[in-house]
Amino acid sequence: VDSSQAATVVAHNSLGLTPIINHGTTEQKEKYLPKLTSGKHLWAFGLTEENAGSDARGTETTAVRDGDQWVINGTKRYITNASTSLTLGVTLQVMTKDSNGRSNLTTIFVENGTPGFESKRMLGKMMWRAADTSQLTFKDCQVPYSNLMGEEGQGIRYMLKALDGGRLSIAAMGLGLAQGAFEMALKHAKTRKQFGRSIGRNQVIGFKLADMSMKLELARNTLYRTCMLKDNGHPYAREAAMAKLYTSEIAREIADEAVQIFGGSGL
């Protein structure tokens, strides 16, 4: 089960579109959303760096205001959807300084093709090879000050909100992977015959399938409950993290058990 296509859609919807919908100005929404909701274009979310990711405050990419322009310098890595022919741009997390000299995360839109901005695909991945993953380089890249998303210095808040929704998307991917592996294993257990009967009639295989089904339903309930909290406007950050972790672990466990049921064919 390859999650490349799912990762492409998830990154665009939860990390590309959602911040613009939640925090963009009316002008920004009118400019970008019609194209980005058409199914013909993609948008990236530039957070991760060599020394920053989960520790977002370690961000080293900077933006300095120069009149009515931002001047951006730095490098981002492992950015999904940044180098495709469909990509229009990236929502970039950068460090800026306030009037007191304090550093804060700020969010800025940078369109593909902007001078000083280069996007390069990262090849040789072990997984998700069909999903675009890129390194972004900014060298004195200038964009209008109006490309600011929301308020200056509030990037950490916007980022965390986007990542909470992203965790639900990743959890859904894990659930789908687990469901697919279970269904394949169940079908194989019914059709593969050894010693005159299907292997699913052996208790050891039947017990494996029962455990897989139980874990699958628990993962589904965990994810759906968290989605219900989000849909009803309740806080869900803790539950989103739990759902992402749990469904990911269950996906690995069920996929591993499926390989065991397939035996040599699983390789």
Indicate where each model-derived feature is located.
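Short glycine/proline-enriched turns and hinge-like loops at secondary-structure junctions
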Residues: 55-57, 82-87, 101-104, 129-131, ...
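Internal helix-loop-helix
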Residues: 1-30, 34-40, 80-89, 100-101, ...
